[in-house]
Amino acid sequence: MSVVSKYVSLKNYIPTGLPKETDFEIKSKEISINDEKNILVSNSWISVDPYMRARMTERKNYKPPFKIGEEMEGYAIGKVELSNDKDFSVGDLVFSSLGMRDKFVCSSDELKKLKPIDMPIQSYLGPLGMTGHTAYIGLFKHGKLKSGQTILVSSAGGSVGSTVCQIAKNLGWKVIASTGSDEKVDWLKNELKVDHAFNYKKVENLVLHFKEICPEGFDLYFDNVGGDFLESAIFQMKTYGRIVICGRISQMNATNPGSGLKNMAYVLVKRLTIKGFLIFDHDNEREPFETEMSKWLADGKIKFKETIYEGIENAPKSFIDLLNGKNIGKMLVKI
């Protein structure tokens, strides 16, 4: 039996600037299970993530570029519709990296069976998925959390940033949160209870602003944006401060990425530690994260918000809106 799969493909590479909807195409093709790919899955939820932007250029990166005209990839949760594999049954909920399409056929090694949980199943793409794991590993392994310190978080209204803020608050940290809209500022202050939140778009001079809101300086900066914000934060880091580099979204979309940090002397003088990390390197470190995060969620100590677009046809728009900061919390496409 064959079925029609609708999917998102990239029409051309985008070396600089923001993607446009005309850079993408919704295509269809017939698929059917066979001896090699013997499981048919219908996706229910598709994760939309900033790292995908790096795969839309031909530059060498930590993941290969998307292939022009072929299915894009991304994390997804789906349900098994047909199976000739003994380990998977019709109705099983599964996780895969075969998102950006409504249906697909695959082999068993491309799927992970999901356990039922007492919360929305898409939590496996949010706080219980890459989002939460990134925040957890970034803080505990690379940020080297110490009690009673002060953390600055950029892109704090997004999925990773908002999780970082809440973990830090749970551990008694002072949390300074930067975001790009007044609505997100309100959410961070009144629902997530950060110590201070501000809309960076309304700040003329970040260096002066940091001195005003945190004169004692930052012990840790969790960087999701890079660029000028990172450079400004370096000035206000404490001696022996730590900077964890999780993303560089401000530079991925820039038409002129700039010449890099101009205040590296402060890294030397302040004896700062700057550490970049990729969550893909930590797939074998999920057990303590899943245990801790599940408890926080059950106790109401981690809250998550979702921005949801309906239908595979709206996946390109959801991605563009993510890069423009129009999401609060996790960006998802519901199929």
Regions found by a protein language model. Give the residues of each.
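C-terminal hydrophobic helical "lid"/dimerization subdomain
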Residues: 3, 280-335
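Glycine-rich beta-strand-centered segment in the early N-terminal region that forms part
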Residues: 30-48, 56-100
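NAD(P)H dinucleotide-binding glycine-rich loop of Rossmann-like/cofactor-binding domains
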Residues: 72-79, 90-155
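Hydrophobic/small residue at the entry helix of a nucleotide-binding pocket
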Residues: 131-134, 159-160, 229
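NAD(P)H cofactor-binding loop motif with strongest signal on the N-terminal glycine-rich segment
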Residues: 155-156, 225
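N-terminal Rossmann NAD(P)H-binding glycine-rich loop of SDR-like oxidoreductase domains
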Residues: 157, 161, 165
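Adenosine-nucleotide cofactor-binding segment
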Residues: 169-232, 280, 284
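Glycine-rich phosphate-binding loop and adjacent beta-alpha segment
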Residues: 228-302, 335
